Amino acid sequence: ITFFFARLETETSIITRRGVVIHGRAVLAGRLASTMRRKTTEFIGNNIKYFIIAPLLTIAESSTELLLPFLMGRIVDDGLNAENSRNVLYIGLWMIGISLLGLLLGIFSARTSAKASQGYGFNLRQAMFRQIQTFSFADIDTFSTASLVNRCTMDIRQIQDAVMQIIRMLVRAPTLLIVSMVICIRLHAGLSIVYWLAIPALLATLFVIMRITKPFFSAMRTRSDALNACVQENMIAIRVVKTFVRSNYEKEKFRRANDALTDTSIGASIRIALMHPCSTVIFNLATIALYWFGGHLVGSGALLSGALLSYVAYLNNILFSVMMFNMVLTRLSRTKPCLTRCMEVLNYESSIRSENGGEPSSMQGAIRFEHVSFSYPGAQRSGSVLEDICISVKPGEFIAVVGPTGVGKTTFVNLIPRFYDPVEGRIFIDGKELRTWDLGSLRQHIGVVLQNNILFSGTVRDNLRWGAPTATDEELLEAARDAQAHEFILHLPDGLDTVIEQGGTNVSGGQRQRLCIARALLKKPCILILDDSTSALDSITERRIFDTFYQKYRNTTILLVAQRISSVQNADRIIVLDGCRICAVGTHAELLQNCGIYQAIYDSQQEGSEADGGRRQ
């Protein structure tokens, strides 16, 4: 497995830490061969016994098949030609017994091979998922979500099937090939010229077919990713599609992606389909030649007729072994893109790694940005999202972040839990540089309510306990009460045991936001980040939540990203972002006097409120 996978990867590519694709042949081949040797041992794991037993059973099964042509020849020569019915019965019973033994060995061989390949796939899938869990937001952006899902499912299934085929056929084929060739030479060395001519012809034919088919396999994986991305995007945004009556557009987009995949698959299938008729022609020509020359030998008495029948059967074994080799290589050619894509994930070095700088028992919540600049990977042309950000936040401060759309408010708060690392500058928490914090400890002290409120399939209790698995029901209800979710939870059909559907589709947007806030509060974080997390709430509910924060969470540093001035006017300080920079910092009253941007936002919202009031009147 290591040898074949490493050899197939000679011309592949890997993604380095910075997302740069490096191409190479000799150096990369050695690097990947080393990686695959290490990974293969890791993925075999506790299934090593199946990887040992399965080939042994396959060899035993192949041995029974090698005995049958010999016994068939003996039936003809010692039974039928000698008119000895007793020999026919005796040898026939032996053939039946050996066939049944081969059947049992085949069943056990297939079973152990399946366990070996399934265990290999299981371990590979676990390793892939563990690796993805270490990815930062930037790393996830490097790979598309649909592509990662495809790699963890369909690609690993292809690799799993390849492992199964290697265990079965790559042991079976050489056994049949070598033993059959030796027997043929012992039966009649002169007739061996037939398979010496047939094998090169068969290999040349199969090589040409594989060569013209290989590019289609890589294209199939790429187009399968595109199709999965199309389906995933449509399912996630189905409400938007329905609202804007864009079903026909989405159908056409899916049809194009489906057509591209289908055309590529058909192209590969047509070329693969050439193997059978071409191989059949070579098989038949070899058999005809063998009967022609063998018939003359039988007529001259140089060869027994039973031996000729055995010779034909062994020749078929030889040619079939070559076909099996080709089937394995074809499978590996199809698996190569899948393996490449899985190795890209497994070899990817996350851009954000924990430095294991210890696990502080507590955090005060002081935050300091020193000349921080940030731009998203691949977005250098469009400029920085944040530039030269300098700000200090005291422990327990309630800080609001406002500004026009697209100025980097979400990016600003996403840097604090290290979802991304700044391109320039440094961030400190409690005087300790952010990169030196243990990543798990850092995020354990920070509660985040994202712009997109994500709930998982499961009960309300399961979702609330996401950040605090040992929390009691009393603690759950207390956090829900602080987030103004207590009342509607109690009115749900099963209360805390009410099942939340995937994505929280069976609760409203406001309920989803409140559940996410309660989930974050349950962590008892030292720093709480609310990224536009009350936008779906009415002003009364929002005010109650913030009143609770001011009264009960005075020791928690809170950063609130908001669009509504009414949401932030009671904050200790308000940061105004504009043009990727901090243009002003102050209280609500100070900014109304000194910051034109803040005043413009405030005035526009006041005018909007008055206009809405006039229309209602």
Regions found by a protein language model. Name each.
Residues 1-7, 14-68, 72, 80-94, ...:
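Membrane-integrated ABC transporters
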Residues 46, 50-63, 98, 102-104, ...:
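Transmembrane helices of ABC transporter permease
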Residues 59-67, 100-107, 159-162, 166-178, ...:
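Hydrophobic alpha-helical transmembrane bundles that constitute the permease/transmembrane domains
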Residues 82, 118, 126-150, 154-156, ...:
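Short intracellular "coupling" helices and adjacent cytoplasmic loop segments at the cytosolic face
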Residues 84-90, 183-197, 267-340, 345-346:
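Helix-loop-helix
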